[in-house]
Amino acid sequence: MAKEKFDRSKEHANIGTIGHVDHGKTTLTAAIATVLAKNGDSVAQSYDMIDNAPEEKERGITINTSHIEYTTDKRHYAHVDCPGHADYVKNMITGAAQMDGAILVVSAADGPMPQTREHILLSRNVGVPALVVFLNKVDMVDDEELLELVEMEVRDLLSEYDFPGDDVPVISGSALKALEGDADYEQKILDLMQAVDDFIPTPERDSDKPFMMPVEDVFSITGRGTVATGRVERGQIKVGEEIEIIGMQEESSKTTVTGVEMFRKLLDYAEAGDNIGALLRGVSRDDVQRGQVLAAPGTITPHTKFKADVYVLSKDEGGRHTPFFTNYRPQFYFRTTDVTGVVNLPEGTEMVMPGDNVEMDVELISPIAIEDGTRFSIREGGRTVGSGVVTVINE
């Protein structure tokens, strides 16, 4: 079977379904694919295909996720659905599936539940830009006023976590009825996707963001200067542009990129995704090291103290066998390097067990270029014991 060509004419976005267990996330995922398939835009997916999610390994963490794709008039979507609550937590913290937006599924019969709140908080912490709400199972609720009440509750909850609760589209429907082919409820799925098209912003492409490249290796070329190699994480760099070298020391230094090489060929510029060598003017071999980043001046700064959301690997995932406490000192692995840091647990949290997710304060022994949303692993003795994302920078 010949591979279909990926259609680039439509913009692409990654989305997912989030919400409390059994509120209908997977049924909704199946309904979206099925209803859009009727409109000739997608391949129908059965509930079973989505629910039997294969295990994936992301940084050694076992996550069950289902990926399906579908298209609307406006966009091509990659949609991720996770069967279990733990899978969501891991997925969002590790960034295994980056989401440009999400559909929050709330059962109209039950209203918001603990995981509803937790998924909204996680979405806020890991930087999901926008949420759209699907009030599911409305066929099971006869009372109009009850529906309005649930909608108000959901909006309040979103506002509590800094999402625009008053403006978020809330679509009421029944994923199951839509799957069964009920035309009125199929229309609700189309309404939902229209809301997703309109309300979830067009993702900014990595190449449009400010330039940043984590340094993987450094060497000097006699007569030409120092070359830093790595993969451009975001943005573009043109020959002759000024950059900053950030991290591992208090002071950042500025220099000019006098050459960009890829596969031994000289380029005028490089962009996100390219593996390059950047020739740096007037920089000695000792001024640059692995673990630093090259970045557009003023766009990212070095820090040692931050708050983070962390998932701690379970014993089965190759993590620790025992809990850890405040003052735990593991290595924090950012992009290309390990830095020792001290963990401070929140008040009321005595210890953290393998398999938990926790908010913690971290202080690193040397500054690293970080910002809200920067991801890292926690390692000890070379093995990964946790995965986290920076939520607040303290200093």
Curated annotation (Swiss-Prot):
Pfam families: GTP_EFTU, GTP_EFTU_D2, GTP_EFTU_D3. One of its GO terms (cellular component) is cytosol. Residues 81-84 are annotated as: G3. It comes from the Bacteria. Monomer. GTP hydrolase that promotes the GTP-dependent binding of aminoacyl-tRNA to the A-site of ribosomes during protein biosynthesis. This is Elongation factor Tu. The lineage of its organism: Bacteria, Bacillati, Bacillota, Bacilli, Bacillales. The gene is tuf.
